[in-house]
Amino acid sequence: MVDNAGDYEARGDRLLGFPLPSPRVRIRPWWFPAQELRNPLVFFLEAWLADLIFGPDRALVPEMEWMSQALLMVDAVDAGNLVEVTVFARPAVQRQVKSVLLSQASVHREQRARAEKMEQLEEFLKAQAPGPQVPQHPVA
């Protein structure tokens, strides 16, 4: 009995020395056909856009996968400035998912550009103002 316990402890110590499995290893969902894993569609997005689209820590990916019936992999590349989006699905679904994601990215880019322009306009107006701003009320 003591020998078995010693063997168990030695084996447990060895197991602790192994590296953890890669987070990219996933089990194929039951609803996804294996043959659709052959030809993925790959495209790139800026990392800040991926954070907005896929949520913090890519929390929205499973829901997007279920709704689109496609598998998505979102991996950081280029020192965290870009992310690689890989879409596994039928070709028509791949194109649709890519189109939706790029449309979302376009909307977020436009919103960011609009916000930056508004900040610049506010700074310009503050710089042009002759003194402290006093709200003027129209006389009724």
Curated annotation (Swiss-Prot):
Q: Which GO terms describe its biological process?
A: actin filament organization; embryonic pattern specification; establishment of spindle localization; establishment or maintenance of apical/basal cell polarity; positive regulation of double-strand break repair; positive regulation of double-strand break repair via homologous recombination; positive regulation of meiotic nuclear division; protein storage
> Where primarily located?
cytoplasm
Superkingdom is Eukaryota
InterPro entries cross-referenced by the UniProt entry: KH_dom_type_1_sf, KHDC1, MOEP19_KH-like
The cellular location(s) given in this protein's UniProt record come to:
Cytoplasm; Nucleus
Under the heading Pfam families, the entry gives:
MOEP19 (PF16005)
In its UniProt record, a GO molecular function of this protein is: RNA binding
Q: Which Gene3D superfamilies does the entry link to?
A: K Homology domain, type 1
Which terms in the GO cellular component ontology are assigned? cell cortex; cytoplasm; cytoplasmic lattice; nucleus; protein-containing complex
KH domain location is 40-101
UniProt keyword list: Cytoplasm, Nucleus
The written remark on domains in the entry is: Contains an atypical KH domain with amino acid changes at critical sites, suggesting that it may not bind RNA.
Q: Subunit structure of this entry?
A: Component of the subcortical maternal complex (SCMC), at least composed of NLRP5, KHDC3, OOEP, and TLE6. Within the complex, interacts with NLRP5, KHDC3 and TLE6. As part of the SCMC interacts with the SCMC-associated protein NLRP4F. The SCMC may facilitate translocation of its components between the nuclear and cytoplasmic compartments. Forms a scaffold complex with KHDC3/FILIA, and interacts with BLM and TRIM25 at DNA replication forks.
The similarity comment for this entry is: Belongs to the KHDC1 family.
Function in brief: Component of the subcortical maternal complex (SCMC), a multiprotein complex that plays a key role in early embryonic development. The SCMC complex is a structural constituent of cytoplasmic lattices, which consist in fibrous structures found in the cytoplasm of oocytes and preimplantation embryos. They are required to store maternal proteins critical for embryonic development, such as proteins that control epigenetic reprogramming of the preimplantation embryo, and prevent their degradation or activation.
- What is the protein's given name? Oocyte-expressed protein homolog
